[in-house]
């Protein structure tokens, strides 16, 4: 599969971010392991932001006035067109770092999890309903394990 990732670093402190190749590896794993495994080409934007920007976007698009770890904006092909665009991912660096520390995970493991999690949202996966959450979390765990990471939900299962 040919993957094009437009990585936009829009956070004030770009230190300790994963390498672009890592984001590409995690995103490709999600696409190939998810509902789009037949896809030959995919294109998406990953924007790494600070809390202010994600809070503004969360309020604007979800009417929720607080930060979140990720926002996913899937692209809808117009009728008659089949473009390789998946959409846009917005990931908040500060929230990812805070969650990793709080959950006792390595920063790299949590970046991988958030990259896979948000890409799956672009592919139509969700976790609002219990059955959907189980399906999505199971797939995330499978993909992360295949990439050498531990189950991101292990502490919740204990």
Curated annotation (Swiss-Prot):
MF GO annotations: metalloendopeptidase activity; RNA endonuclease activity; zinc ion binding
Superkingdom to which the source organism belongs: Bacteria
Annotated positions binding Zn(2+): 117, 121, 127
A Gene Ontology term for the protein's cellular component: cytoplasm
Keyword Hydrolase appears in the UniProt entry: yes
Principal EC category: hydrolase
Keyword Endoplasmic reticulum: no
InterPro entries hit by this protein: MetalPrtase_cat_dom_sf_prd, YbeY, YbeY_CS
One GO term (biological process): rRNA processing
Alphabetized SUPFAM superfamilies for the sequence: Metalloproteases ('zincins'), catalytic domain
Cofactor note: Binds 1 zinc ion.
Keywords: Cytoplasm, Endonuclease, Hydrolase, Metal-binding, Nuclease, Ribosome biogenesis, rRNA processing, Zinc
Gene3D superfamilies documented for this protein: Metalloproteases ('zincins'), catalytic domain (3.40.390.30)
Major subcellular location class: cytoplasm
Localisation: Cytoplasm
Enzyme Commission (EC) number: 3.1.-.-
Required co-factors: Zn(2+)
HAMAP family with a match to the protein in the record: Endoribonucl_YbeY
Family that this chain belongs to: Belongs to the endoribonuclease YbeY family.
Record-linked PANTHER family: ENDORIBONUCLEASE YBEY, CHLOROPLASTIC
Function per UniProt: Single strand-specific metallo-endoribonuclease involved in late-stage 70S ribosome quality control and in maturation of the 3' terminus of the 16S rRNA.
Protein name: Endoribonuclease YbeY
Organism phylogeny: Bacteria, Pseudomonadati, Pseudomonadota, Gammaproteobacteria, Alteromonadales
């Amino acid at each position: 599969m040919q993957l094009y990732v437009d990585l936009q670093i829009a956070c004030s402190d770009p230190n300790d971010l994963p390498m672009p190749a890592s984001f590409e590896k995690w995103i490709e794993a999600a696409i190939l392991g998810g509902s789009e495994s037949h896809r030959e080409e995919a294109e998406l934007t990953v924007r790494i932001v600070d809390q202010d920007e994600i809070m503004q976007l969360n309020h604007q698009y979800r009417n929720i006035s607080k930060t979140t770890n990720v926002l996913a904006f899937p692209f809808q092909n117009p009728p008659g067109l089949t473009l390789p665009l998946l959409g846009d991912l917005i990931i908040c660096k500060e929230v990812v770092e805070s969650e990793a520390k709080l959950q006792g995970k390595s920063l790299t493991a949590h970046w991988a999890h958030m990259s896979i999690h948000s890409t799956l949202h672009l592919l139509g996966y969700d976790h609002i309903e219990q059955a959907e959450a189980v399906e999505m979390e199971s797939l995330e765990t499978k993909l992360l394990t295949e990439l050498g990471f531990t189950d991101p939900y292990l502490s919740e299962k204990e």
